[in-house]
Amino acid sequence: MEKIAPELFLVAGNPDSFVVDDLLDFSNDDGEVDDGLNTLPDSSTLSTGTLTDSSNSSSLFTDGTGFSDLYIPNDDIAELEWLSNFVEESFAGEDQDKLHLFSGLKNPQTTGSTLTHLIKPEPELDHQFIDIDESNVAVPAKARSKRSRSAASTWASRLLSLADSDETNPKKKQRRVKEQDFAGDMDVDCGESGGGRRCLHCATEKTPQWRTGPMGPKTLCNACGVRYKSGRLVPEYRPASSPTFVMARHSNSHRKVMELRRQKEMRDEHLLSQLRCENLLMDIRSNGEDFLMHNNTNHVAPDFRHLI
């Protein structure tokens, strides 16, 4: 170990009071080490030696002298100041970076109080970091849909929409009223025209629709017109609401209509046969009388009166 210059540790006020050369004289260290390898000192001697050294060192500081009274060269003082400034700047730079990251505050002034404030235990910094992080964390939102969102409605826009709906609703009502009036006029026209109109087949006056018949358009009622269009309109067919409907002669059922027609045909045939028989008898009588009359005129009977 190199020797330290003795003039560095001279006492500034009283150089004769204490000399550090005796304490820092390590010239005989090698010899003492060699001797110590051969003979080890006792524990009692060691303890007494340490006690004397401690008493000497305490007397060194109690005599009114200290480290502040020591003489230190200017170069060493400049190096110490540079080292202290470097440490302060390094601590200040790290803390400033943390503050900028966490809270965005301005750079703090590097004073003695701020240095003591910045040197804090780790848990407090973690707690501050957690609080600031929770306050600045942005909550993730849901992904926006592609559907266009309607603008936020206000009371003015709602009033405008209500006014527009009120303006459109009267137009719709007017249209409905006009359509109803037009339908009523059509019904009135049909009623007026149908008041003097009758079905030429069943003589009915009320029908939902007038249809085309053998005498032209709108000459048959709806029921008779449908049967006429299908070729089944016969004299025996009459709707039940017809004023000329007779149960014995008419029906609104096709099956019964066909039966009535068959019965009528049978009656007609019977009548025709009777007429034929009567005509034959009439012909026979007329022919016999004509024969007798013809014979009487052409042939004269003999006269037998002379025989009597």
Swiss-Prot record:
One of the Pfam families matching this protein, by short name: GATA
Function recorded in the entry: Transcriptional activator that specifically binds 5'-GATA-3' or 5'-GAT-3' motifs within gene promoters. May be involved in the regulation of some light-responsive genes.
Name recorded for this polypeptide: GATA transcription factor 9
Gene3D superfamilies per record: Erythroid Transcription Factor GATA-1, subunit A
CDD domains per the UniProt record, alphabetical: ZnF_GATA (cd00202)
Organism: Arabidopsis thaliana (Mouse-ear cress)
Recorded family membership: Belongs to the type IV zinc-finger family. Class A subfamily.
Segments forming GATA-type zinc fingers: 193-247
